[in-house]
């Protein structure tokens, strides 16, 4: 008991001296790690009063090695808790019960963290890293063990932006790496992945090199192939977002979404070229949504494996990601310079239209690039002064609304009718419009074109790109997103595209019939 009291006294005395240098302002708080600290941590209310009782929704923890971890702040039973991202910080620094942490507020929502052992002495972190104990392995969200060897490791200081590189140890000094549990053919870990036996064999992570299909601006994991329908979906998205570097396309497997330790392996060459050089928290965001997720990007100590884990499970859960869905990672940097990716989620459906999906009997429901809502009381219009997409039917109510608009316009030029769906308005990550073969071959010029869109009653003009598509159809991609947002288009709205014959350049006037608009 006396020993424990002296340990606490050391920590408190050290903390007091540290705070005395801060000009009388409360910038620090000190906590000793008690039981169950590994999953969450409560911030003292007295310290929170300095911030008016609240913190921002996320904070940044700067480790002794200069690595920045983004941790989510939540409220529970009148307590402010660090949760999502905290476990990754604990695991990375091998924090144990009775260790002490001193948090120093730097600016905004950023804190420097000093880690003290149970004796009140600062923990020293070498470049070679520290062997993990079994207790850490049990709570670690990653389904792999860390290599026990010295190795090349590059750290980047978040303050000075300087790089520190460790000396490479000779091969004879390297320990044996921990063997992974049985992995899938794409090199991703299985559901449990906790086998800690050692082996000289190369990990399957080292074989998980990316594939870039010829002429495509995206990367696939090794052993992954896309059906024609999937390729078409990805091509449409890539043409729309115009990425500076290839996007990463991952088809979700059981280990990515359903495993207790769900994670996502990033191909080695792709990750080493485009992801951070150090294990750290990164930011994921969905297109058009404000919410962010902060999974841990983890680099295996021998450099053979790269993965997302930890709060990756939260991303999967919150976005209802299922096995067979496609996640397309568009790498970018968000406000403040934090590294992250915008994730475009393309769902797998069970409709029997186009393209086999993986090894199951499921299909992507494209229907000329669309996922059409089910309608009742359907009849196909035969003789009409407008055209629709192939295989598209209108309800009697929709026909009546369309014909009222067509009659009021009295257009001499041809008209094309399109019912907005997920792929048209960005709900599934795409912003495209397909002009069906019959309309495209009869009225539209061949090859890639710039098309001007006008709106009745508005002076704005939108420039969009129109590109050829298989089957003699034409597709609007780049620029269509702005038209959708500016005109607040929603699913089941109807757009009538009126081709203007008296314009010097290719132009269409768009007439919108809102879903809830009454005749």
UniProtKB/Swiss-Prot annotation:
Chief place of localization: nucleus
Entry keyword set: DNA-binding, Nucleus, Repeat, Transcription, Transcription regulation
Lineage top rank: taxon: Eukaryota
A single MF term (Gene Ontology): DNA binding
Keyword Iron-sulfur applies: no
CC annotations in GO: nucleus
Compartment list: Nucleus
SUPFAM superfamilies referenced in this protein's UniProt entry, alphabetically: DNA-binding pseudobarrel domain
Acidic residues bias: start-end ranges: 189-209
CDD domains: B3_DNA
InterPro entries: B3_DNA-bd, DNA-bd_pseudobarrel_sf, REM16-like
Pfam families linked: B3 (PF02362)
Region (Disordered): 138-218
Annotated DNA-binding residue span(s): 26-119, 249-349, 416-516
Protein's UniProt name: B3 domain-containing protein Os03g0620400
Provenance organism: Oryza sativa subsp. japonica (Rice)
């Amino acid at each position: 008991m006396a020993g424990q009291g002296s340990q606490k006294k050391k920590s408190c005395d050290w903390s007091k001296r540290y705070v005395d240098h801060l000009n009388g302002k409360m910038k620090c708080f000190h906590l000793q790690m008690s039981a169950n600290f590994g999953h969450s941590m409560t911030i003292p209310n007295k310290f929170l009063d300095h911030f008016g009782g609240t913190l921002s929704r996320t904070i940044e923890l700067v480790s002794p090695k200069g690595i920045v971890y983004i941790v989510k702040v939540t409220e529970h039973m009148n307590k402010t808790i660090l949760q999502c991202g905290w476990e990754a910080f604990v695991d990375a620094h091998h924090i144990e019960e009775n260790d002490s942490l001193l948090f120093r507020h730097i600016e905004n929502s950023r804190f420097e963290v000093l880690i003290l052992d149970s004796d009140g002495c600062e923990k020293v972190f070498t470049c070679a890293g520290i062997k993990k104990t079994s207790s850490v392995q049990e709570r670690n969200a990653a389904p792999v063990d860390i290599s026990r060897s010295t190795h090349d490791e590059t750290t980047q200081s978040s303050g000075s932006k300087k790089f520190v590189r460790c000396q490479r140890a000779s091969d004879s000094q390297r320990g044996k790496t921990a063997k992974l549990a049985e992995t899938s053919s794409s090199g991703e870990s299985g559901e449990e992945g906790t086998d800690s036996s050692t082996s000289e064999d190369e990990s399957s992570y080292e074989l998980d090199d990316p594939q870039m299909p010829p002429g495509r601006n995206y990367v696939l994991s090794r052993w992954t192939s896309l059906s024609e329908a999937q390729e078409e979906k990805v091509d449409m998205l890539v043409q729309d977002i115009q990425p500076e570097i290839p996007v990463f396309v991952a088809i979700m497997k059981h280990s990515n979404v359903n495993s207790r330790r769900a994670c996502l392996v990033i191909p080695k060459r792709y990750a080493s070229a485009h992801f951070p050089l150090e294990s750290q928290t990164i930011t994921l965001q969905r297109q058009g949504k404000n919410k962010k997720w902060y999974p841990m990007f983890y680099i295996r100590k021998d450099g053979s494996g790269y993965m997302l884990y930890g709060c990756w499970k939260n991303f999967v859960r919150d976005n209802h990601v299922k096995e067979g869905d496609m996640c397309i990672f568009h790498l970018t940097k968000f406000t403040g310079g934090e590294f992250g990716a915008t994730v475009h989620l393309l769902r797998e459906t069970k409709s029997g239209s186009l393209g086999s999906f993986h090894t199951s009997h499921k299909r992507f429901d494209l229907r000329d690039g669309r996922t059409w809502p089910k309608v009742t009381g359907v009849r196909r219009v035969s003789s009409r002064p407008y055209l629709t997409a192939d295989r598209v039917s209108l309800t009697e109510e929709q026909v009546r609304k369309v014909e009222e608009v067509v009659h009021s316009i009295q257009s001499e030029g041809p008209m094309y009718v399109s019912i907005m769906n997920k792929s048209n308005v960005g709900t599934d990550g795409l912003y495209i419009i397909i002009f069906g073969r019959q309309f495209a071959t009869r009225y539209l010029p061949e090859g890639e074109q710039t098309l001007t869109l006008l709106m009745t009653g508005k002076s704005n003009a939108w420039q969009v790109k129109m590109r050829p598509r298989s089957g003699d159809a034409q597709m609007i991609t780049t620029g269509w997103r702005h038209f959708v947002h500016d005109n607040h288009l929603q699913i089941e709205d109807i757009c009538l595209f009126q081709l203007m014959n008296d314009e010097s350049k290719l132009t269409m006037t768009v007439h919108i019939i809102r879903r809830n608009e009454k005749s």
